[in-house]
Amino acid sequence: MKFTNSEKLHQEALQHIVGGVNSPSRAYKAVGGGSPVYMERGQGAYFWDVDDNKYIDYLAAYGPIITGHAHPHIAKAIAHAATTGVLYGTPTCLENEFAQMLKEAIPSLEKVRFNNSGTEAVMTTIRVARAYTGRTKIIKFAGCYHGHFDAVLVEAGSGPSTLGTPDSAGVPASTASDVITVPFNDIEAYKAALNKWGDQVAAVLVEPIVGNFGIVEPFKGFLQEVNELTHRAGALVIYDEVITAFRFTYGSAQQIYGVEPDMTAMGKIIGGGLPIGAYGGRKDIMEQVAPLGPAYQAGTMSGNPASMAAGIACLEVLKEEGVYEELDRLGKRLEEGILEQAREHGIHITVNRLCGALTVYFGVDQITNYAEADASDGEAFAKFFQLMLREGINLAPSKYEAWFLTTEHKDSDIENTIDAVGRSFAEMAKTL
């Protein structure tokens, strides 16, 4: 493959855009550097770049594009919105319709509010939790990403449960000190944190299925015990389902495990490819939000007709019979095929998968928390990424990210991908 036009465009971008990209995850820093590939169009499960190279896409825009690129039902809804006005600044019937769809799909949502991104949604749930409880501290789990706002850009210290330290320049230490970080799936560390700071904790922020250091499920009973301990301490449980809502089932991850949080933040898939965020939960908590309560949240673009129309159309596609069963079937075959190729070529990997999302980790035997994911072989992944790119397989350029299947992937795509994995592993095996 040649990437001449991508390389030229990246040099041009570096003159105008900070780092040449509008989100750091799009750079190839974690996979050896160089110019990222510039895509020109997408259709179904495929991308074509500016050099006319074709790819099977497993990035899915980091998760939102579960129905594939340019899905006709969603495209029609967006086109209609474009001709009737994309932004009014007034309430619309689409907001009512979409809110009702979300409530019917996720029973814990007694009231809903739309905004414009997952970051905004999580940020506001924290504000609401603090308003409701009168407390300030938040507990999060190490390695779980909840957006780029100050309150959650923190990392763990050296102990099993520690006050946070800033994970980004520009985040005040005073802000980070209100965030307590504990390892995911470690209920004893969580108990220790509550024992030490419980009367100061407003809420715990949980990815019920981790999506930001790969796909990692909770241990059996972990979420239930977190709920029980949190409520006993007088704090709230917030689920960050920005990645997980409508990814594994028609609804949310909380329904898979039979646990209800007090509030839920959403984004990505529910926008049908357009910018969106939403949060919701118990009525008495949500009524802390203005104009009913003292917790302020607003947005010029919130609930705009284009995003509402795209979101409604996306959920209509996902509600069709057999969607998630097919994603699971294809995901299982892809997982099995990758593991078969690894055994054949002597490549040490483990694969975490749920339904149509999976992560391939190099050089490790299991991944149940961030420390284990962090210990996986980044150099091996970088080599694998570059080889797969040249095989026409588009993956996220990070060892921590997931492969996302869409409703448009076919059996032939999976088999072609497994073959590409085999050729890539064969090349990697030469240097073992």
From Swiss-Prot:
UniProt-listed HAMAP family: HemL_aminotrans_3
Keyword Isomerase attached: yes
Name listed for the protein in its UniProt record: Glutamate-1-semialdehyde 2,1-aminomutase 1
Family annotation (NCBIfam families): hemL (TIGR00713), PRK00062.1 (NF000818), PRK12389.1 (NF009055)
GO terms (BP aspect): protoporphyrinogen IX biosynthetic process
Predominant subcellular localization, coarse grouping: cytoplasm
Main enzyme class: isomerase
Gene Ontology molecular functions: glutamate-1-semialdehyde 2,1-aminomutase activity; pyridoxal phosphate binding; transaminase activity
Cofactor: pyridoxal 5'-phosphate
Compartment(s) where it occurs, according to its Swiss-Prot or TrEMBL record: Cytoplasm
GO CC terms in record: cytoplasm
Keyword check for Cytoplasm: yes
Alphabetic keyword roster: Cytoplasm, Isomerase, Porphyrin biosynthesis, Pyridoxal phosphate
Biological pathway: Porphyrin-containing compound metabolism; protoporphyrin-IX biosynthesis; 5-aminolevulinate from L-glutamyl-tRNA(Glu): step 2/2
EC number(s) given by UniProt: 5.4.3.8
Signal peptide: none
Summary of subunit composition and partner proteins: Homodimer.
